[in-house]
Curated annotation (Swiss-Prot):
Alphabetized Pfam families for the sequence: Ub-RnfH (PF03658)
InterPro entries: Mopterin_synth/thiamin_S_b, RnfH, RnfH_sf
Protein name: UPF0125 protein YfjF
SUPFAM superfamilies: MoaD/ThiS
Organism, scientific name: Escherichia coli O157:H7
Domain of life according to the entry: Bacteria
Family, per entry: Belongs to the UPF0125 (RnfH) family.
Length: 96
């Protein structure tokens, strides 16, 4: 008989962070952890078809299993291309 595991689910905004602790059955998935956390109801801007997820900063799939003590992270979409921003900063500093 599978036991219980404790998992944290995190979602960070620039000025507010959400960290929910959930208890799940062993063998639960990333998606089950997110749904159990209640964050989808709290934050309507989270869309699991769009937002990427990870476990301790490593990319994960919604179907991946979680383990006791894991921290599932929901990532916000990038609003700008990092390469483009670096290029713009380099141009700006070169023009000074």
């Amino acid at each position: 008989m599978p036991g219980k595991i404790a998992v944290e689910v995190a979602y960070a905004l620039p000025k507010k962070q959400y960290l929910q602790r959930v208890t799940l059955q062993e063998g639960a998935t990333v998606e089950e952890a997110i749904r159990a956390s209640g964050l989808l109801e709290l934050r309507t801007d989270i869309d699991l078809t769009e937002n990427k997820v990870g476990i301790y900063s490593r990319p994960a799939k919604l179907s991946d299993s979680v383990h006791d003590g894991d921290r599932v992270e929901i990532y916000r979409p990038l609003i700008a291309d990092p390469k483009e921003l670096r290029r713009q900063r380099a141009e700006k500093s070169a023009n000074k």
